[in-house]
Each structure stands twice: as C-alpha cells, then as structure tokens.
Amino acid sequence: MDARAAISELVVANRVVAQLKLVDSFGHVTVRNPENPQRFFMSRARAPGLVTKDDILEFDLNSTPVDLRGMRPYAERFIHGCLYKSRPDVMAVCHNHAHELLPMAVTKTVMRPALHSAAVIGHEVPVWDIRDHFGDGHRHD
C-alpha cells in the first residue's frame, strides 16, 4: 500500500466509524504512513463523518505537523504520536470519547476485566494519561 491508498482508506475509516456511531464528533482515526513509518496521517480537527482527502494532514512521531496548510489539527494528535512512537508494530489508531468510560476516568476508578475473554488484559485495564507525558495545562498547539 502506498501513501495515497492509506489516505483513501483513512477517509473511509473516518466515515465508517462515524456512520456506525463508534465515535462522536470528537473521535478520530489515524494511520501510519506506509512509505515513511516515522510519520502518520490524521484529519484536521473535523467531525469524522465529514472528512475528505483534502482534510488529511501528515505528522511526525512527535506529532509535529509536516504542513498544516492553514488547517487546525486535533490536540489529541499527541496520543496517536506517542502510540506510534512506542509501538512500531501499530499501523492505525482509533480514539474516541466513550461516554460509558468517562466517569471512571474522571474519578480515577480502576477498571477491571469482567469477562473471561478479557483475562489477557491482566488484573487492571491499563490507562494512558496524557498528563504523564505533557503535564497539566501545558498547551502544545
């Protein structure tokens, strides 16, 4: 797959996750650039159901845009960049704001697997907190 095909699939992925209501207006999907694994593609800050190929931006693994072309990027791009940087085997990421999980996140409630098929997770569900990497209140845009 080349970069152009990856961008086309990324546009379709955005539309599909929106249509299936897997993300709301604030969720997003990214894909690693197959021609340069040190970069990834992500749409500009826009509802996934509206994304077109012209909305796709490229970022390095520090989440620095290659060329913004006057568009505003998602602030959450840092989550994606950190995942791609730490996991070279990851080729795509979908981030959403699961309303069912938000109360657990803001109250620091430990999430535990409740089904036998989730036993591979361990005793607690791992949580990645952006503050551990970027601190509180620091603006990165």
Language model regions located:
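Glycine-rich flexible loops
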Residues: M1-D141
